[in-house]
Regions:
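Bacterial signal peptide processing site
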Residues: 22-24
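Alpha-helical segments in soluble extracytoplasmic regions
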Residues: 29-104, 109-111, 116-158
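Positively charged n-region of N-terminal signal peptides that target proteins for export
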Residues: 1-4
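Internal alpha-helical transmembrane segments of multi-pass membrane proteins, especially GPCRs
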Residues: 6-10
């Protein structure tokens, strides 16, 4: 009877231990980050790219400044506020989030400089803003690569 009880106890303990081994906190945190917490931020980014896409049809710097001041900067600032409320549980996902915050901060700096340049007609300020926007795109590429690598390391994938 003792042998049967000991065997049964070992089986129960083994099942319990194996069930605990299947959990990956980074995977869970990343899935939550991408599919829940970043949902609104990603929607804002889509609106940002759509608004910038309209610039080709705008006739003058005043219209571009209005686009920046009335639409783009509020979207970027809103994204930065939403990002403040996101608190990943793992260091790996925190690092990914920090990369995205840097992207948005760089967009903000670029849009602010472009807005000022449109108002003052200062070519140097416009160039500075354009360079910052190019830097933001490069940072976004780095964010996406880091995100894809982390997802791959933890058995997930990123869909765009």
């Amino acid at each position: 009877m003792k042998k049967i009880f000991a065997l049964l106890l070992m089986v129960v303990m083994s099942v319990t231990l194996l069930a605990g081994c299947g959990s990956d906190p980074v995977y869970d945190d990343l899935e939550n980050f991408l599919n829940v917490e970043m949902k609104e931020v990603n929607a804002d980014y889509t609106k940002i790219t759509e608004e910038v896409g309209k610039w080709e049809t705008l006739e003058d710097d005043t219209a571009i400044k209005k686009s920046i001041d009335d639409t783009l900067l509020p979207l970027v600032n809103g994204s930065l506020e939403k990002l403040k409320d996101i608190t990943p549980e793992t260091e790996e996902v925190k690092a990914i989030k920090d990369k995205y915050v840097k992207v948005m901060e760089t967009y903000k700096t670029g849009f602010e400089a472009l807005s000022e340049g449109c108002e003052t007609q200062d070519e140097a300020t416009i160039n500075e803003g354009s360079q910052k926007l190019e830097e933001a795109v490069e940072l976004l590429d780095e964010y996406n690569k880091a995100l894809e690598e982390l997802a791959k390391e933890h058995g997930s994938e990123v869909e765009y």
